[in-house]
Amino acid sequence: MTGKTVTRADLAESVFRKVGLSRTESAELVETVIDEICNAIVRGETVKLSSFATFQVRDKNERIGRNPKTGEEVPISPRRVMTFKASNVLKTRILKAHVSRKVKLKPQNPAP
């Protein structure tokens, strides 16, 4: 892992360099796309970005949990959660990048 976090500014800069919009237009485009995704999720819609991932809101029922320290049963209230499911295309890209990185880092056996 590189430890790098990609920010909105990074995405806007990438749009600026690759698409040719101005920096302001690039930032506005990124914000608009993020806003549309967020609004759809808030409305309870599933957002599917082909070859990337699916964002979905799920309702979770009330259930009984346990306090790990005391073992006491505690009710967990019903709630809505968002799930992110990577597409098979993205999973494959991640795996290939991991494998190629691992091969590059593999120590060479010294010649006899």
Swiss-Prot record:
PROSITE patterns: HISTONE_LIKE. SMART domains: BHL (SM00411). One of its GO terms (cellular component) is cytosol. Keywords: DNA recombination, DNA-binding, Transcription, Transcription regulation, Translation regulation. SUPFAM superfamilies: IHF-like DNA-binding proteins. Gene3D superfamilies: IHF-like DNA-binding proteins (4.10.520.10). The keyword ATP-binding does not apply. Signal peptide: none annotated. Pfam families: Bac_DNA_binding. The keyword DNA-binding applies. One of its GO terms (biological process) is regulation of translation. One of its GO terms (molecular function) is structural constituent of chromatin. Heterodimer of an alpha and a beta chain. This protein is one of the two subunits of integration host factor, a specific DNA-binding protein that functions in genetic recombination as well as in transcriptional and translational control. Belongs to the bacterial histone-like protein family. This is Integration host factor subunit alpha. It comes from Rhizobium etli (strain CIAT 652). The lineage of its organism: Bacteria, Pseudomonadati, Pseudomonadota, Alphaproteobacteria, Hyphomicrobiales. The gene is ihfA.
